[in-house]
Amino acid sequence: MSLYKNKKVVVTGGSGFVGTHFIQELLDRGANVRTSIHKTPLKIQDDRIEVLENIDLTKLDDAMKLVEGVDFVVHCAGYIGHPSSIPTDYQIGLNQINVITNVLEACYKQGVKRFLDLNSSTGYPDRRYPITEDEYWDDEPFISYYSYGWMRRYREKLMEHTSHLTDMHIGIARGTAIFGPHDNFDLKTCHVIPALIKRCLSGEDPFVVW
């Protein structure tokens, strides 16, 4: 039997690329899924999805409302900027911290049993060889993602601290160059792999990899 069968599961960031896939997978496994809409509509429509509208996770009251009465939370929400803006966009980092802090506090207060965070590989140091997970904290984050990478590291320490103080089971997935259906393929704002796919399908000739 699926761990998620008949469980109430919240997916934050359910209108985003990765959140969309989590919702579909959880529905397929028999979960009762709840998500929220802040600015962007959902990419999939299914009557089995409970949708709360106008939820702003930078506000603790909204986070409390979203996770009330649920068993598990899959946290995919975040403020995303174009890669070129990450080193300098102070507001992106601040909002990310506000969101994770509010969601974790809400989960603790509402008695959520399990919490999965979709984090990022931007916290890893710069290496000229295939890096391992154990090297995450060995050096400073890569300079192009320096402040953003430290924010991502802070998230993990915050979750580690929370797991020590509560009974909540917390897992972290460090996403690396994720791509696929429902991704952003706008060449002005997308990441490297979606851009390469879009350019390849458009018949670019010669095809130049940056």
What are the roles of these predicted feature ranges?
Residues 54-97, 106-109:
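NAD(P)H-binding glycine-rich loop region in Rossmannoid oxidoreductase-like domains
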Residues 127-129, 153, 157-210:
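NAD(P)-dependent short-chain dehydrogenase/reductase
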Residues 31-39:
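Conserved glycine-rich Rossmann-like NAD(P)H-binding loop of the short-chain dehydrogenase/reductase
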Residues 59, 98-102, 114, 154-155:
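Conserved cofactor-binding/catalytic machinery of classical short-chain dehydrogenase/reductase
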Residues 8-29:
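N-terminal Rossmann NAD(P)H-binding glycine-rich loop of SDR-like oxidoreductase domains
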Residues 12, 36, 73-77, 115-121, ...:
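SDR active-site strand-loop-helix element
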Residues 96, 148-152:
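Active-site YXXXK catalytic motif of short-chain dehydrogenase/reductase
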